[in-house]
Amino acid sequence: MLQLTTYRNLQVFLVIMTAIGMSFALFFLQRYMGFSPCPLCIFQRIGLMIMGGFALIAALFHPKSMVIRLLLWLGSLAGIGWAAIVAGRHVWLQHLPADQVPSCGPGLDYWLDTLPMQQVLKEVFAGSGECASIDWTFLGLSIPEQSLILFSILILTHLLILWRIVRPATPKPLAR
C-alpha cells in the first residue's frame, strides 16, 4: 500500500503547492484579474519559491543522510516562514484604521535601485497604501489572509516532514 506521508511524498506535496500557489498568483491574479503585486506580495512569493526550491532538491535527490535532510528542511522552512511572516504583516496592514495606513511610496523597483538592501527591507515592512488595499476577496478572505492560511498549512507540513526525518517510516512486514 502506498504511504502518502513518506519523506519524498511530502516534499513532492510542497513542490506541487508551490507550483499551484505561483500559478494562481501569476496566471489568475496578475494576468486574468489584472492585479499588480505589491512589495509585500512579491516578498511572499520569494519565500514560497525558496521553499519550493529546497523541496524540489529534496524530492529529486532524496538524500539518505539525516544531516542533509535537516539542512534542506531548514532551508525550506526558512522560505515558508519568511512568507508567513510577510503575509502576517500584510494582513496587519490591511486591518489598520484608514487614518493609520502608510502613504504609497515610490515602489520596490525604485527602492532596489537607490537604497541598500537593509533599507529596502525596512521600507517594504513599513508597508504602503497599496499593500493595505483589499482588491479581491474569496470566502470573505483577502489575498494575504488566504496566503497566510496556505503558509500555515505548509508550516504544519514541515512539522510532519521533521517527524519523518527524525523517525523514518518503517516498512510493515508483509502479511502471509
Swiss-Prot record:
Protein origin, superkingdom: Bacteria
Membrane topology: Multi-pass membrane protein
GO terms, biological process: protein folding
Keyword terms, alphabetized: Cell inner membrane, Cell membrane, Chaperone, Disulfide bond, Electron transport, Membrane, Oxidoreductase, Redox-active center, Transmembrane, Transmembrane helix, Transport
Coiled-coil stretches noted in the UniProt entry, renumbered to this chain: none
Cytoplasmic-facing ranges: 1-11, 64-70, 165-176
One Gene Ontology MF term: electron transfer activity
InterPro entries named among the record's database cross-references: DiS_bond_form_DsbB/BdbC, Disulphide_bond_form_DsbB, DsbB, DsbB-like_sf
Residue numbers on the Periplasmic membrane side: 29-46, 89-145
TM region positions: 12-28, 47-63, 71-88, 146-164
Subcellular localization: Cell inner membrane
One Pfam family of this chain: DsbB
Disulphide bonds in the chain: 38-41, 104-131
Cellular component, GO annotation: plasma membrane
Main location, first listed in the record: membrane
Function: Required for disulfide bond formation in some periplasmic proteins. Acts by oxidizing the DsbA protein.
Family, as annotated: Belongs to the DsbB family.
PANTHER family the UniProt entry points to: DISULFIDE BOND FORMATION PROTEIN B
UniProt protein name: Disulfide bond formation protein B
Provenance organism: Psychrobacter cryohalolentis (strain ATCC BAA-1226 / DSM 17306 / VKM B-2378 / K5)
